[in-house]
Amino acid sequence: HRVHRRQRQMCIRDRHTTGDKILDRPLSEVGGKGLFMKDIEKALVAGHIDAAVHSMKDVETFLNPKTTIGCILPREEVNDAFISNSSESLKDLPYGSIIGTSSVRRVGLIKNHRPDVKTVLFRGNINTRLQKLDNREVDATILAVAGLRRVGLVNRITQKFTLEEIPPAIGQGAIGVQCRLPKCKADEEILNWISKVNHRESAICVESERAMLGALDGSCQTPIAGFSKLTQEEKITLKGFVISPDGTKIYSESDTSSQADAAKLGQEIGQRLLVKAGSDLVR
């Protein structure tokens, strides 16, 4: 696709990543959520592309040091949604029902609410997962509201979870653009251009959440969740969670700081959770 705007020309290249191709195994077994961005990041660093667009919940904890997030677009709703053709909510599912999900976070949280429920691997895009649900391979699934909205399928939502019921993934609902750190005038111009569409409020929240993730050194094997909110008087509140894979334990920490200290707040929350949960859970 080619887009012309203000005398600039962009060539948009669609790329299928390794994460899109390996669908028969959990992400934690094949390299983690970074599989959705590694191929694109390599192309960025090599200079084959000038910017990479990511769902921030799929972005690795630590970026390639030659790159940065140039902007965060206005964030969508961060909640998760329960989808079923037979039950109105998670609590209404019959005993021993099967829920399809590929997320260790969702598995832990589901088990916390419904220890009797069985979870099975559920990979693929939104349409693929919903087709599996409609084919009765599972009784229900859980997906991000933001993802459903982007493909026009919010009508499939049976129950929207509150942030406390099923806390979201770090960065959920946010789209970010990764750029090279400038080493030449062209890179500097690209970063400057992209930064002009940065949504300040969304960027502050994502920065705080990812700082928490960094303090925990969280990977796809660790059930970690969290959400942040800007409040009056230039404040930000962050709440983070570490969940045991079997759902028997949930550790949480929350606090408020100035928006200027958003990253510091995230680091502090992460360090507190690390002490609470211990290295047996955070790995």
What label would you give each PLM region?
Residues 1-8, 12:
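Single conserved hydrophobic/aromatic residue that forms the stacking wall/gate
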Residues 45-54, 58, 136-146:
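Alpha-to-beta junction loops
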